[in-house]
Amino acid sequence: MPVRPARCYKRIKGPPYTREEYIHGAPMIQIPKFDMGTTSAAARTAFTMTAKLVVEERGQIRMQALEAARQMASKYLTKYVGDANYYLRLNVVPHHVLRENRMLAMAGADRLQEGMRLAFGSPAGRAARVEPGQVLFYAEFKPEHLPHIKEALRRAASKLPLPTRIVIEPKGNGGNKTVT
């Protein structure tokens, strides 16, 4: 069955539905990697700048959108910066199980199926619930790679259903922030 559009799941309605021991048939999390690039702490000491992709609205982001954004950013950085010159981390995990009340659509149907009101639905996917100001992607890099990092995060943001902003700052405790 085809996947419903993201607009069906963008808004948060009701409490989170995360208890897998009570949910039969909950889909697995389909994000294979959360850390990309140079992942060793010793090699990351050479990076002096950080960039964050910060969400600006409350909502839900499906795991397919998170995976598409991760792949887009990772492929761009691998091609133009190289795996040894950046560290990228996806900070959110899609724990919330999405439900779908499936309706039958038949060829030649002259009536619409109404179904049951307030039907609970069966598991159809997963989403991460995010709040304003929450960091979706975190990157560490050298200053000479700043344009490529910004472009990679911009491309990742284009795959997400919520508005975001990119925050650039020096690595360490605080410092001057540059919001773009």
Curated annotation (Swiss-Prot):
CDD domains, per the entry: Ribosomal_L16_L10e
NCBIfam families associated with the record: PRK04199.1-1 (NF003236), PRK04199.1-4 (NF003239)
Family: Belongs to the universal ribosomal protein uL16 family.
UniProt-listed Gene3D superfamilies: Ribosomal protein L10e/L16
Recorded GO MF terms: structural constituent of ribosome
HAMAP family in alphabetical order: Ribosomal_uL16_arch
This protein's encoding gene: rpl10e
Keywords (A to Z) from UniProt: Ribonucleoprotein, Ribosomal protein
Name of the protein: Large ribosomal subunit protein uL16
Disulfide-linked positions: none
GO CC annotations on file: cytosolic large ribosomal subunit
Pfam families linked to this entry: Ribosomal_L16
Entries under InterPro entries matching the protein: Ribosomal_uL16, Ribosomal_uL16_arc, Ribosomal_uL16_CS_euk_arc, Ribosomal_uL16_dom, Ribosomal_uL16_euk_arch, Ribosomal_uL16_sf
Keyword Ribonucleoprotein: yes
Top-rank lineage group of the source organism: Archaea
Any one GO biological process: translation
